[in-house]
């Protein structure tokens, strides 16, 4: 009986404790502690601010139970709706910001600022072209060896844009620098298709073979539907030719936010009589401005690409055909994606076909020291057919945004820690002045890196040294693989491309996220960090990126869309980061 009373007493105590805990939880939900209350993003839209409005906003948010604010300068072409527009970081703007800091502090509200004007990512008008995001570019020349050569190499591309000499940004700034000269002895089976004198016909338009195979992306031909509503481009050879790969560029690429698997935009068909065509394969839309795919060896006289989902404008459907090249030797499948020009997430689904008919690793020669200041190469070339590549770098062209015009400039190089250091110290100094020195324990207590949106840069001036330090071998003999050429073997070339992407990801992790987090801590602040948000936006590892934060952050949208599962992945990544690295708090942009 005594034991029964003891058990009943224990049960009663447990029930009472559970009831108290439930009651306590209900009370805390109704009146949450300060650390559990929401923070909000407070956008100062294009200079439409006033002290009167600042005070009203903050007092209203405080009454609503909001515990903190993240103050953004944003633009989005917002029209002026106040009598007097106040420009970013002018003395008058700083006075308003200092007033906001004072009011927020008096109300017990925490304050955060993003890592740049706008919300993505780390850029501003003080970033110089030298310190901005960059891409790798190349020009190619075919020569026959077995003699001393003097070759005037084409100049490196200086265009600001995302790929080669495609102009697709609104950045007027320029920067370019040579990386190196590398020659590759090609297999005897490698033939420039233009030398076979094919004819090019299209559904409606007037491209030339030279224009479609010259590697110049600044010139495109508008190709429209034929009478039956089909858009196509066709090479016809005098005799059957065996083709192992193709590349195609129509000026389109998958946007940063559409990283899911693309719909099928093109297909390849072949024929021997030009009348009856057989489908060879579908061609997924590229994640870059050009796509290279390998093919099963295919022999035919006619090779036709057919567009299934063309663009549309006021004049109707069309394709802006820039390049359409066929190759008689194998190329890297999804070469541009594997070279980092996009962060396509399913590369393991697109392996390159094994082929022994490739350039040997010993058939690569670095010739940088044999080129004079005018770009003239003098070289005793061994026998064989060679392609000489001139590699360079130019600006990627991304700008921070969406900020007010006065706060907009180039995005800093995310792979150059010194450049990021200069950038973030200047940025924090601006806000130290604007806040009257209130950074750290009071005033601006947090920094925030929002989701990554500036695009996929593929080069930094430190890349050769960083690559060799991390991977243990020189990058220079392998640079031609970034163009799609297979060197050594498919396995060796794919390994190099993996190493290249890995290096980009590591440099972003250490140079952007670690440096900005360190800067926040140096100045007494804590930091929120988001990473990919929707899809795979960069080559850095999201968990490693968020591990640099004090508060890892994900994002979610209250929409009914098929791709929202990617946001779930982002939230799971965020919670995983907190569990693995012992973060007390997790934030959600929602």
Regions found by a protein language model. Name each.
Residues 1-25:
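Bacterial Sec-dependent N-terminal signal peptides
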Residues 38-50, 79-95, 122-125, 283, ...:
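The substrate-binding groove and active-site-proximal loops of carbohydrate-active enzymes
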Residues 53-74, 96-102, 442, 545, ...:
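Catalytic domains of carbohydrate-active enzymes, especially glycoside hydrolases
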Residues 59-61, 102-105, 521, 526, ...:
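Catalytic-core region of carbohydrate-active enzymes that cleave or remodel glycosidic bonds
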Residues 74-195, 330-337, 344-345, 355, ...:
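Acidic/aromatic-lined carbohydrate-recognition and catalytic surfaces
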Residues 111-122, 448-451, 506-538, 590:
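Aromatic-lined carbohydrate-recognition surfaces of secreted/lumenal glycan-active proteins
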Residues 119-132, 451-461, 528-561:
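Substrate-binding cleft/loops of secretory-pathway carbohydrate-active enzymes
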Residues 214-279, 286-360, 451:
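Aromatic, loop-rich ligand-recognition surfaces of beta-strand-rich domains
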